[in-house]
Amino acid sequence: MVNLRFEAVAEAFRKRPLDVAVPQERPSEYFAKKVFNRQKMYKYLPLDVYEKLTDVIDNGAQLDRSIADDVAHAMKQWAMENGVTHYTHWFQPLTEGTAEKHDAFVEHDGKGGLIEEFSGKLLAQQEPDASSFPNGGIRNTFEARGYSAWDPTSPVFIIDDTLCIPTIFISYTGEALDYKAPLLRSLHAVNVAATKVCHYFNKDVKKVTANLGWEQEYFLVDADIYSTRPDLMLTGRTLMGHDSAKNQQMDDHYFGTIPERVQAFMKDLEIQALELGIPCKTRHNEVAPGQFELAPIFEECNLAVDHNMVLMSLMKKVANKHGFRVLLHEKPFDGINGSGKHNNWSLTTDTGILLHRSGKTAEDNLRFVVFIVETLMAVYRHNGLLKASVMSATNDHRLGANEAPPAIISSFLGKQLTDLLDHIELADKKDLFTVSGKKGMKLGIPEIPELLIDNTDRNRTSPFAFTGNRFEFRAVGSEANCASAMIVLNAAVAEALTNFKQRVDALIAGGEDKTSAIIDVIREDIKTCKPIRFDGNGYSDEWKEEAKKRGLDSESSCPVCFDRYLDEDSVAMFELTNVMSHDELKARNEVKWETYTKKIQIEARVIGDLVMNHIVPIATHYQSQLAKNVQSMIDIFGREEGKLLTERNIKIIKEIAERTQLIESGVEELVNTRKVANRIEDAREKAIAYHDNIVPKMAAIRYQVDKLELVVSDELWTLPKYRELLFIR
């Protein structure tokens, strides 16, 4: 075991970049090669079936079960032509991963043989065991039935020899047990609410689509070195390890030259992702050593979420092929930046208008201001809930550190937009518009330059920043399912727009002009949501105090943050928008608390095992070597001179004794504290106990271990150090 670390390091240095077979076609030609997209639908489906299916996808029409057999037959034909032998209902349970059960395209032919079959019934619906997935008590073990149901708005795709069918996952009694079902409901809610508001400006708008562009950060670690770190293998992060002398302080990794092995991995990943219809656009080194980013072109929100889940799975497979392990944990290494997944969110009409982009006419700019302000209203009203949507045991390590957005949700708008909203709020109403004959009201809002997108500065400390034509939600964790944040954001914006329209309609019904009514409500909302606007340093202590004064949620305990899901305002918002019921919210919180507890529990067990089976034996072994050296020197030179010559060694012997004693007592305390916490039956209280009592004890043990790493002989230390984990690739 002593030499395993060095063998792993030597093996890592011997690795060379793999040759990647690049397709002869252009990327645009092999894009979505493994996706049953519209082109394939048109080719394989009867025209009337194709038109009915696209009506479902584009217009939300009810799926006609009569076409399911035709669609299933076409999918099977296309899939088998591409070497597919199995199919699966691919869904996203509350594990934050994906789930799938593969079935073959075979049935008895009645003659002792087999025949390839795939019916509309198998396409549309299956029955996984709902009790075996996180369900928050909705399903008991003896109440196993759940349903997965086809989502036709997200195209099926091929992974290896399996046809993957995106589905929702619900209980026998209809409650959502996944991320996709409430996401689809939230997208419907924001579509309906935004479309109604758009009709103030353009009656031709029939649909508003929420877009999402995610930016996936990750770390790559050599597979051999990774295999000698049990903490990385079992928890996704290093539970111990002293800083490397060189980490990110030189600012030389960000946008630096991509290492050759990593470049080969990225190339291979992009080719496979493009074949799966994921429109990869950007790749680069991130700030921390060993950290990288991949970002696609934005897509419709539901599809973007599916693509991110596919990509995270694909990354692991491709990394293994190239001799790496990909780390998606938000904070795999202490002392350097963690990983996030910025979610760029926007709304677009079916007439091609981006609702968060300024226009060329006064009416366009009024519409722009409406959607900006109502988005801010949503974030203001539900800032604590938005934070809860991105909180987890893993993201807890990243949020609030001076590397990521703070754990207080605020919005940065930039000087131009801030000045505009201040002008609308403070100016006399008569100065904001003028009457222009029979054309009605004409806004006198100062011109918003077309270069707004370039004139909007960046504030990396802002969790929810306006970046010219969209909002960037930066608090989402790298390992998270984007749907969690998008469900809350879409529902909150839908509620804000609905409330806005009700008030405007009331003023119009009272005889006020439409434009005047819109301005009245917008001015009121600008004042109301002003506390959410913050353009300063989100890391400062002054901001934390100011945020409390503004009434913003400043809670930093992850388990306590989950309470926001069951606040009266949150439940009312989810029920108003038909996104989730009170029972579904309650069940999800149970899952969140249980998941938090289990993750910390695993970490506590792993750190206890590592320190007692690796660190303490290594340290005491080195201590014994030093003691023998001291005794030998005394035997040769005499007690007085021998002690003088070995003064440094004696000091280290004492330090090792003190630190190992603290570690051993710390592990004993950790175990006893865990036993106390495990006796707590309430999921929320147990999670809080783990957060408040166990996490600090783990940190105290780590502190002693990291100090020992600096004094114990490098030759004896069995766990790869940060310099090896981060710089050998």
Predicted regions and their residues:
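Active-site core of metal-dependent hydrolases
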Residues: 30-142
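Histidine-centered catalytic micro-motifs
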Residues: 89-92, 341-345
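Short linear, low-complexity motifs centered on an aromatic residue
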Residues: 96-113, 130-131, 229, 236-238, ...
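C-terminal amphipathic alpha-helical interaction region
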Residues: 524-729
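Flexible inter-domain linker/hinge segments
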Residues: 5-11, 20-42, 188, 192, ...
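Glycine-rich, acidic/polar active-site loops that bind/position phosphate-bearing ligands
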Residues: 143-328, 333, 337-340, 347-590
